[in-house]
UniProtKB/Swiss-Prot annotation:
Keywords: 4Fe-4S, Cytoplasm, Iron, Iron-sulfur, Metal-binding, S-adenosyl-L-methionine, Transferase, tRNA processing. InterPro entries: Elp3/MiaA/NifB-like_rSAM, Methylthiotransferase, Methylthiotransferase_CS, Methylthiotransferase_N, Methylthiotransferase_N_sf, MiaB_methiolase, rSAM, rSAM_horseshoe. Binds 2 [4Fe-4S] clusters. One cluster is coordinated with 3 cysteines and an exchangeable S-adenosyl-L-methionine. SUPFAM superfamilies: Radical SAM enzymes. [4Fe-4S] cluster 2 binds at residues 159, 163, 166. It is found in: Cytoplasm. This is tRNA-2-methylthio-N(6)-dimethylallyladenosine synthase. Gene3D superfamilies: Methylthiotransferase, N-terminal domain, tm_1862 like domain. Residues 145-383 form the Radical SAM core domain. The lineage of its organism: Bacteria, Bacillati, Cyanobacteriota, Cyanophyceae, Oscillatoriophycideae.
């Protein structure tokens, strides 16, 4: 296939985290710069790209299921171009080609900005695997963003941590921070385009700047997430700032104080704790104790008493005892999270914990996950009660898909909120809403 016969329609299916979603937006922008048009239906597309996740085994198996269907279609439509990007592509590399030889391109997440160059090789008749570690270059194309109100901006790629259960450093590479100038320029453009909220993204976002040159007179890194928040805070048009995901090792009081002082920074913090037991945390190689984690949350609430806290937790880690699991339950009960993403431990290839001989049964993991989720829902419902009859600022993002007489958006604390209104008139507006009904993870109210 040559560039002149490039397929005109494309479809991207994205699995996994916000980083993957942001990568997909950038790759969509590249494809549209190349002349491709979006297709809602993958079965009518000439190029299909799966941006994959390898955090858990079920996500990986789902990818192979999708690929199997499209591989059959390619036998009937040989001009179909099949691309696998993201973390499964990085982890499996050429192994995917042996399993699905119909693939045209396998590319790791570090190569997202090189999509056009890689497709040029494909259209010249090559089957391409791009998984070698590289320095991530700035993307000069405009992402095809899924929203016209909120936007993600990557500020740091990769991860230098070596958690014993996690495959991310293997598939996303070492930390690479973007320059403050590049981040500012992207956000300035977003403000001019009418975006109201920006979420800064990174695997360990509070580690931002450690790899950039320069130190201060006091010996700290010259570029940090705290400094960046001050730098981008006053960009015209941007009304709200968020950031994710934070690592407890790098979440400082200086950062907390900045979030308190800067009015555009929303009072919502996503800080995974993974386990409430110190021995499990040590086995996970997380680099902190549950006491350290509790201290961070206490400090946040000292500066911002009403702040919303969300996190991630893993149950059924190899060797986790019932008593250790109960320490996780105790931490969740004590802190009271607004939202908690929970998962049963899933062994990932290439990670130390995957080959340990003290794996727990699926029955134990399932039981613990169910018990944790029950507590999470209870605590979230209790946390929601504080919103009842309060007036909250809601950024309207879209129409309620279940009720077209309502719009939906999020509070500064990241609570999904519904109220009656016309999306055409209200989209992108900050509206004061009196909360009349509360649920564990969402609110309903009336515009005032």
């Amino acid at each position: 296939m040559t560039m002149t016969s490039t397929p005109r329609r494309y479809h991207i299916t994205t699995f996994g985290c916000q980083m993957n979603k942001a990568d997909s937006e950038r790759m969509a922008g590249i494809l549209e710069d190349m002349g491709f048009k979006w297709s809602e239906d993958p079965n009518t597309a000439d190029l299909i790209l799966y941006n994959t996740c390898t955090i858990r085994d079920n996500a990986e198996q789902k990818v192979y299921s999708y690929l199997g269907r499209q591989a059959k279609r390619k036998h009937e439509h040989p001009d179909l171009t099949l691309v696998v990007a993201g973390c499964v592509a990085q982890q499996e590399g050429e192994k995917i080609l042996r399993r699905v030889p119909e693939l045209d391109l396998v590319m790791g997440p570090q190569h997202a900005n090189r999509l056009q160059d890689l497709l040029t090789q494909v259209f010249d008749g090559n089957q391409v695997v791009a998984t070698e570690p590289i320095h991530i270059v700035e993307d000069i194309t405009k992402p095809r963003r899924d929203s016209t109100v909120t936007a993600w901006v990557n500020i740091i790629y990769g991860c230098n941590e070596r958690c014993s259960y996690c495959v991310v450093p293997n598939v996303r590479g070492v930390e690479q921070s973007r320059t403050p100038e590049a981040i500012y320029a992207e956000m300035e453009l977003l403000g001019k385009q009418g975006y109201k909220e920006v979420t800064l993204l990174g695997q360990n976002i509070d580690a931002y700047g450690r790899d950039l040159p320069g130190v201060t007179e006091t010996g700290r890194h010259q570029h940090t997430l705290t400094d960046l928040l001050y730098q981008v805070h006053d960009i015209s048009g941007i009304e709200r700032l968020r950031f994710a995901t934070s690592h407890p090792r790098y979440f400082t009081e200086r950062l907390i104080k900045a979030c308190h002082e800067l009015p555009k920074v929303c009072e919502h913090f996503h800080i995974p704790f993974q386990s409430g037991d110190n021995d499990v945390l040590k086995a996970m190689k997380r680099g902190y104790t549950h006491e350290k984690y509790r201290h961070i949350i206490d400090k946040i609430r000292e500066y911002m008493p009403d702040a919303s806290i969300s996190a991630d937790a893993i149950v059924g880690f190899p060797g986790e005892t019932e008593a250790q699991f109960e320490n996780t339950l105790k931490l969740v009960d004590d802190i009271g999270f607004d939202q908690l993403n929970t998962a049963a431990y899933s062994p990932r290839p290439g990670t130390p914990a995957a080959i340990w001989d003290n794996q727990l049964s699926e029955e134990i993991k399932s039981d613990r996950l169910q018990r944790l989720n029950h507590l999470v829902a209870q605590k979230a419902a209790q946390r929601s009660q504080r919103y009842l009859n309060r007036i909250e600022e809601v950024l309207v993002e879209d129409e309620n898909p279940k009720d077209n007489t309502q719009v939906m958006g999020r509070t500064r604390g990241n609570r999904l909120t519904f109220f009656e209104g016309d999306i055409e008139a209200l989209k992108g507006q900050l509206i004061k809403v009196k909360i009349t009904e509360v649920r564990a993870f969402s609110l309903t109210g009336e515009a005032i």
